[in-house]
């Protein structure tokens, strides 16, 4: 039976095995999907071991997406755009790297939340692997403007310099330079939720009818509490993004596109 896994640190909380099992059952695919916690200095060794054991592919989560990018012997255009990889496929000794985070996020916002991004003012918090993975697909959705904010502004500026913004106004700044700014969509791509940490964000970020979106899932994060206190019209966690990016990875591996709605509903009800 074909075997897959998710690799991260930490990874105990991951719902990816449940999601892929549901997709497999729904589509009649025979596969096994597990989770592997890699030591912080042991990602490459773990991937090599799984590849040698005959695994067909792995998903990659925090904090290994940049290492996965470097490890891949072949990269898709969207992986190159992201500079980070969350889906590896093992084929005839080669390691194919792709990134499904961005398409997962955009599909969740546009389809599941029925919230348009075109013409909107978007704030992306963070400049790590999660933010890298979603920047280009967000720009492809044609927002009016997109601001990347990060504690260290040079990381945000470097990230902005690596993409083609098209018609979107793109800028980068530190968290301390967000005062007096207003946005229609604020996306938290930092790992602050993992550490129960509140970001140093000013009051007044949310425009009327604004969406606050945290890529973390499983519980209310400090960012989501902040958004509620600040009066954000809609607040969403990253469960929909998780399911949508998993569906794209499943399609890459199996060439069958699963229906995400029943899987999301089951996870919400659990």
Swiss-Prot record:
Subunit structure: Homodimer.
Tree of life domain: Bacteria
CDD domains xref list: NAD_bind_Shikimate_DH
Gene: aroE
EC supergroup of this enzyme: oxidoreductase
Any single GO BP term: shikimate metabolic process
Protein known as: Shikimate dehydrogenase (NADP(+))
One cellular component term from this protein's GO annotations in UniProt: cytosol
UniProt xrefs under HAMAP family: Shikimate_DH_AroE (MF_00222)
EC number of the protein: 1.1.1.25
Pfam family, one: Shikimate_dh_N
Catalytic machinery residues: 65 (proton acceptor)
